[in-house]
Amino acid sequence: MRENKENDARYDLIVIGGGPAGLTAAIYAVRSGLNTLLIEKGICGGFLNEIPRIENYPGFKQISGMELASRLKEHAADYVEIREIEEVLRLSQHRGSNQKSSDSFSSSADFIVQTTKQSYVAKALIICTGTRHRKLGVVGEDEFLGKGVSYCATCDGFFFKNKRVIVVGGGDSAATQALFLKNMGCDVTIVHRRDSLRAGKYLQRMIDRAEIPILWNSEVKEIKGSDRVECVVITERGNEREIPVDGVFVAIGEVPNSELASHLNIECDDSGYIVTDRNQRTNVERVYAAGDVSGGVRQVIVACAEGAVAAMSAYEDITSEP
């Protein structure tokens, strides 16, 4: 049972983020005996909720991302307290009375987690905050968000049935979204800035079979319209032209949600991903990171594995303290 002191709920471990890494970490942590809380700013599942079909997660020949997310959450909820729609605003570390403000973070001090609802205290933290969609950064992108511009075909594809859409990008996400939209009955074209796709060969073959056209060596420079998207400005090998479209689906990668790392001086790489060792430990004692926020191979099964490793490392470090 958790204790209360000075109105702060106290835990052994707080997991921040309810994607595959966070949910798995929470399961492993509680099963090892750690009093654990999971905090998720939205709903559990993360990007899983946007994946229309998964065919490489062991145990399921085919499953939707939303269904897998639901099963992971249901499993975790049997073990751990989950608080959704609660965003972590600030991380800090309590200093003992004999510690000077200039001292580095103490290895024995508790962490204070301040959210939109209350504050919590924990002996250890696992950061599993994932990533967010990278933006094109062009005129009209923000203006028409929700009015023709989208980052999630699974979420918004239904509204574009029998309409003209483009998918911007050349990786697995772009290919998957294009195929989903094609199956929804959309008139789909892929716009890619290079002369070949980065998506896996299996997805490329599916794109070919679906006869989805691709504009090679092309970039979106502007999104235009009145109340909704009406066309995009494309540059292809220096030549500029307008293409009439009803929807623009952006799939050009992700940016790590690692802003909380700066609160504790947690090391990040040049791209903003949290740096960890092979046991998911960061440079700050009793702080761990797992899943997409720590970079590496961004796959669901890898995120789950990293979450499990992080929880085991946390258990080892907490129980080894005198």
Outline where the language-model segments fall.
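Beta1-alpha1 glycine-rich phosphate/pyrophosphate-binding loop at the start
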Residues: N7-Y79, K163, S173-G200, L215
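Conserved phosphate-binding and hydrolysis motifs of nucleotide-dependent enzymes
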Residues: G17-G22, G130, G169-G171, G291
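Phosphate-coordination loops involved in phosphoryl transfer and adenosine-cofactor binding
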Residues: R10, I85, K161-K163, N217, ...
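Glycine/small-residue-rich loop that forms an oxyanion/phosphate-binding "nest" at active or ligand-binding sites
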Residues: I82-H94, F111-T115, S119-F159
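A Rossmann-like FAD-binding core segment of flavoenzymes
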Residues: A76-G96, S107-Q114, S119-A122, K182-R278, ...
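FAD-site-proximal beta/loop scaffold in flavoenzymes
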Residues: R132, G137, E143-F159, I252-V302, ...
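A charged, well-structured terminal subsegment
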Residues: A308-P322
